[in-house]
Design a protein with these regions (language model features):
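Conserved phosphate-binding/catalytic region of the ribokinase-like
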Residues: 28-132
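Conserved beta-alpha-beta core of the PfkB/ribokinase-like small-molecule kinase fold
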Residues: 1-33, 50-51
């Protein structure tokens, strides 16, 4: 079964609400998140405009979103994951990682496309540096 595979082989999981509901056969996000917490080291459930829930195997934390004017949501989930993984590899802190992932996703949705231009990188670096 897929859940057995995850438990035996996966440390960090990223999911959105529909994926989480399918994975556990439940529309209850809180219950499904608690089940996921029991089988992986850490991860997050992306909640779109409502932010995200990040967790380790014993605690969870809601990451509130900053409301921004979205131009293009392409790449937001990937940018969140990249920020989370980069921060987690440096800090081993799932809350800081979720905040950085969220900050990067907030920045990428304010521009067209899924990649920052060189001219935008200083603003992005400055924004995430406050979390370290």
């Amino acid at each position: 079964e897929f859940l057995d595979f995850i438990e035996e082989n996966v440390d960090i999981v990223f999911s959105n609400k529909p994926e989480l509901h399918i994975l556990f056969g439940s529309k209850n996000t809180e219950v499904s998140t608690k089940k996921l917490m029991n089988i992986v080291k850490c991860g997050c459930v992306k909640l779109g405009k409502k932010g995200s829930a990040v967790f380790n195997n014993s605690q969870s934390c809601k990451i509130e979103p900053k409301i921004v004017a979205a131009k293009d949501t392409t790449g937001a989930g990937d940018m969140y994951a990249a920020g989370f993984l980069s921060a987690f590899s440096k800090t081993n802190d799932y809350i800081i990682s979720g905040k950085i992932g969220s900050a990067l996703a907030e920045e990428i949705i304010q521009i067209n496309g899924a990649q920052f231009k060189k001219s935008e990188m200083e603003k992005v670096r400055s924004k995430i540096s406050k979390f370290y």
